[in-house]
Each structure stands twice: as C-alpha cells, then as structure tokens.
Amino acid sequence: MSERKLFTSESVSEGHPDKIADQISDAILDAILEQDPDAHVAAETAVYTGSVHVFGEISTTAYVDINRVVRNTIAEIGYDKAEYGFSAESVGVHPSLVEQSPDIAQGVNEALEVRGSLEQDPLDLIGAGDQGLMFGFAVDETPELMPLPISLAHQLVKKLTDLRKSGELTYLRPDAKSQVTVEYDENDQPIRVDAVVISTQHDPNVTNDQLHKDVIEKVINEVIPSHYLDDQTKFFINPTGRFVIGGPQGDSGLTGRKIIVDTYGGYSRHGGGAFSGKDATKVDRSASYAARYIAKNIVAADLAKKVEVQLAYAIGVAQPVSVRVDTFGTGVIAEADLEAAVRQIFDLRPAGIINMLDLKRPIYRQTAAYGHMGRTDIDLPWERVDKVQALKDFIASK
C-alpha cells in the first residue's frame, strides 16, 4: 500500500486584522516611495476596535498624510460601515514615526566594503539593513511554481473577496480565512484535496445553510480543479456556526504576523523576517524576493523540480555571507554548480537586488494580501523567469 502523506497550508483575506495592518504599512511605504524612491522606511501598524496605531522609523524627504492613507486603505478593504465595529470614517488614527537610528543608517548608507576604499563599486555602497537569513522556494506543482496547498488557500480567500466586492454575495463581510489539506503520493506529487476549511465573516441575517451552499458552489468548486475533489474530500464551512463579529472588532492585528501566509504556507523554511512596511534596503524583504526569483528560474529552467535557496547577510555588509541551494535530490546537476551559477548571474548585494528587481517603486501595497510569492494576478519582478537562458548557458559552459 502506498504511503499517504498530507500537507496543510492556510491563508487569510485582506480583511483579516493582521492583513489590515500589513496593507496599511505597505500603503504608507508606497506613498513615501512615490515622492522619495530612496527613502528608508520601517512602518509598523497595530489595529484593534476603533483604533489604528502606526509607529516605526523613517528617513525621507517626503511628506505623507498618514491619516488619509490609513483611512483610504481601510475603506478600500471594505470596512466602511459602523456596524462592522471598525470603519474608515470613525477609526482613530495615531501615528508615531521617528527618524531612523544614525547607527543603522551608517551601515546601510556606506557598506563595510567601501569604508576607507578609494575604488568604489556603486553597488557596494548599500550595506544590508540588518543581519538575517532568507529563503526562497519553487516547486513544479503548479504553473506558477508554488506548493499547491498555499496556492489554493490564497485563491479561496481571494474568491471570497471578489464575490463580496462585486456584490454577488452581499452578506459577506471582509474578514475570512481558508485552509487546504492536500494528499501527496509516494513521489511527492499532489493527487487530491483531503480537506478544505473556510471561515468567512457574514451579516447576521444569512443562514448557515445558505452560506454553506454558496461557499461550496461559488468558491470551492470554482477555485479547486475538479480532479482534486472526490467524495472523501471534507468541507468545513464556518465550523463554529457563526462569524458576525470579525476584523479588528474580534481580534487585534499587527504587521508581520502572517509571514507563513505571505510565503510558502510552511512548505519551505522561513528566516523569520516579515516584509510589509519595509523598504528594499531591508534584506528581510528584498533578499526573500531575490531568493524566490532565483528558485523560480532554476525550476523554470528544468534544472530541478523543487529547490530552496537560502541567503544570509551581516548588517552593514553588502555581499551575502552565504548562499545555499538545496534541490532535495531533484536537481539534474550538482548543487555546487547551481550555487556557482547563482553567484555569477544574480547580484545579491542589496543595491544589486534593488536594481535587478527595480524595487524603489511603489509596488508593495498589492503584495500585502494573498501572498507575496506566486502571484499571477499582478506583475511582480521576482516572479519573472527571465534568467532561464542565462542559467542554462552557464551550466552548458561548465
């Protein structure tokens, strides 16, 4: 009998409290970058019933109306009614942003590699904004080269949001969560969906039967390919029986608390650093994007079926302290050769990553819900596969 292996990932909608915080932080970042592409930003947000607190450190020449950005973001998410207990019009906004520490700025603005040097490479000028380790991952389970569980989980909550915003399901409210369990065969290939959990906030007048019927027909059956579903697939729709109170009225939210949702759903390792509210000199964000870019191009080049890339940095130093490529036995060449190719083809200094992926643009708010990786609905530079030929050429030359 073949071994049955299950793997589960979850996602949350843009109306989840932690995701509200992420979107506010990234909306502030984008507003600053629109005026000052060289700004250094670390904006954190906390939300709870009736209040939003924005705090952190910035260095910028820009002036941004934080109050307006916060309220616009909340309204766009869909918290625009007093009965939700959290609305764009009535929420209290409390900003507390201060100047970036000069000790940190010293290492970011002038990397170790150029201090005291007469010959300077411009891309050596920016040092990593902190120490840390970052992971990128790709696998051939889906067209976007993502693990199937997180891909489906994102699509489910995005579909709920689309149905809410289009007016097709008027009783839906902004907060929602999904969870998908996928069964894999002995070759680690996904063969079926074993369980789906969806909890969605709703108006008090909708019946559980109606909600259950609509979620099955209009969400699950529309999102999950039919060949993954069978009569053994379990559906848990609002299993508590009621989800009227949600969003920040139900739970407080904080930037950076959904880092597994933001990446690979637990299928790959995570270095621990969050993304939202941080400009690209923070390698927590930019190097994670670079690692995904590398991993996706390796799989797209058919050099491995599954690959995880680890990068690590020291604060104030431009060059990564380590680069590691793990193909989990699926690679067609030695991992040492792949690592050599990565170092040759991808500039992994912070300034190199920023240039390579054009990260000084205000593109971040759109990443703050439904995942930073594997997106097919928006054009993100780290999702492009434009290094495939360079990788193949390098390997062929060895």
From Swiss-Prot:
Binding annotation for L-methionine? 57, 100, 251, 282
Work out whether the entry's keyword set contains Glycoprotein: no
Q: Which family is it part of?
A: Belongs to the AdoMet synthase family.
Q: What is the annotated quaternary arrangement, including any partners?
A: Homotetramer; dimer of dimers.
The Gene Ontology CC terms held by the record are: cytoplasm
Keywords, sorted A to Z: ATP-binding, Cytoplasm, Magnesium, Metal-binding, Nucleotide-binding, One-carbon metabolism, Potassium, Transferase
**Assigned EC number:** 2.5.1.6
Main location (coarse class) = cytoplasm
Q: Where is this region: Flexible loop?
A: 100-110
The GO biological-process annotations, alphabetized, read as: one-carbon metabolic process; S-adenosylmethionine biosynthetic process
Organism of provenance: Streptococcus agalactiae serotype V (strain ATCC BAA-611 / 2603 V/R)
**What's the protein name?**
S-adenosylmethionine synthase
